[in-house]
A protein has these predicted regions:
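Polar, enzyme-active/binding microenvironments
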Residues: 1-266
Length: 266
């Protein structure tokens, strides 16, 4: 990637644009970056860029290492990808800048981990690390996009892995997974962790997405049942949980996104 620091005149800019070497500023909510994980039976570096306006899919800049079982959070400028398992648990994170499709190093996690989850707002991403040292953990990290700093966040109420998370600009709802119904409500201001209304069934290998009002949780693998179609609707106002419309097929280990500001459900 060329160095764009310093002063550029209009002719130089137009020459760079013509050569596809000038970064294009993307409006918030225009693209989603997908890390594919396992491809053809092996961990991959492959990422796709999905453009919402015309439902087009293109190659995105690859990850720094082949990986799977990671997590990601971001804002309208960058996405922070915790790579997860790169052959073993990893603390590596990548910073994907949407303008220019640039992949760079992000500040590492506090511990090597995988099977985590993440949610955040425009300022911070809260990463539940999942499996650390071969066991489910309560560890969470707070990643501040401005300055790319990583510090400890308030721990979960119980050890967990394979959960999911979604939220709005104020709180993140973390379904802890590990075949339990427990959910936590993480308030970004003050870094406060509290009990949230439980899921309708004990489950793990989940996914979640939402907007400023509700989050939809696909429960994934329900304890004693297996892969499921079950979804819950969590309403932030009142902290209520209700049944949501089921998925089209039994599934587990999926993923989800929604069309708020890129990377943030606002």
């Amino acid at each position: 990637m060329p160095n764009y620091s310093g002063s550029w005149n209009l002719v130089q800019q137009m020459q760079a644009v013509a050569a596809s070497n000038w970064p294009v500023v993307l409006a918030p909510g225009t693209v989603g970056i997908f890390a594919l994980g396992v491809v053809s039976g092996a961990a991959s570096t492959t990422r796709n860029k999905y453009r919402f306006s015309d439902c087009s899919n293109a190659s995105a800049t690859a990850a720094s290492a082949a990986s799977y079982l990671g997590s990601a959070a971001g804002n309208s400028t960058v996405g922070i990808f915790a790579l997860g398992n790169t052959g073993s648990a990893s603390s590596t994170r990548d910073k994907y800048t949407y303008s220019g499709c640039v992949n760079g190093s992000a500040t590492a996690a506090s511990a090597a981990s995988y099977l985590g989850s993440a949610a955040g707002n425009s300022i911070v991403g809260i990463f539940a690390l999942g499996i650390v040292s071969s066991a489910a953990s309560t560890t969470r990290d707070k990643y501040t996009y401005s300055g790319c700093t990583n510090v400890s966040a308030t721990a979960a109420s119980a050890t967990s892995c394979g959960g999911s998370a979604a939220g709005n600009s104020t709180v993140g709802i973390f379904a802890l997974g590990s075949a339990g119904t427990t959910r936590n409500k993480y308030t970004y201001s003050g870094c406060i962790n509290a009990v949230a209304t439980n899921a309708s069934s004990a489950s793990y290998y989940q996914s979640a997405a939402g907007n400023s009002t509700v989050s939809i949780f696909a429960l994934g693998y329900i304890n004693g049942v297996g892969a499921s179609t079950t979804r819950d609707k969590y309403t932030f106002s009142g902290d209520t949980n209700a049944t949501a419309t089921s998925s089209s097929a039994n599934s587990l280990g999926g993923s989800a996104a929604s069309n708020g500001t890129t990377g943030v459900n606002v």
